[in-house]
């Protein structure tokens, strides 16, 4: 079955908040000396089920962050969030980074670290258990986490795909 991501078409009515995940300074050595540029990975979300990520590169940090925010606004998806948690367990990997997300009861909080926490906070998840294995590269962790969130399906979506009622999804 092909995965259809829930793309967000318009950002006009969304109040997006941006979070800086990581900044990387890159040095290019030339005959005339060293040239420094900066790469910033940024996550934007409305804390209500919409998330996007972007990478910006520039000669100055603020310009790199601004470019990352603009790139993230062009790359938004909608994620089903119910009662502050995700609907089901989900695993995903990107490059050498593997992530595993598991729903949690109310009051648990976001049990995730680093780049995964920024993504989950931006999407509006308040209770989730998360584990990352393999690479801790923030670029790959962000992409793997967003891939896992993009593969989430709400019970209503599962019921519509199967042609059954929502009650049958839970009770078999």
From Swiss-Prot:
GO MF annotation list: rRNA binding; structural constituent of ribosome
Keyword Ribosomal protein: yes
One GO BP: translation
Record-annotated membrane-spanning stretches: none
Sequence ranges assigned to domain S5 DRBM in this UniProt record: 16-79
PROSITE patterns for this protein: RIBOSOMAL_S5 (PS00585), S5_DSRBD (PS50881)
Coiled-coil regions listed: none
Role played: With S4 and S12 plays an important role in translational accuracy.
Family (UniProt): Belongs to the universal ribosomal protein uS5 family.
The protein, known as: Small ribosomal subunit protein uS5
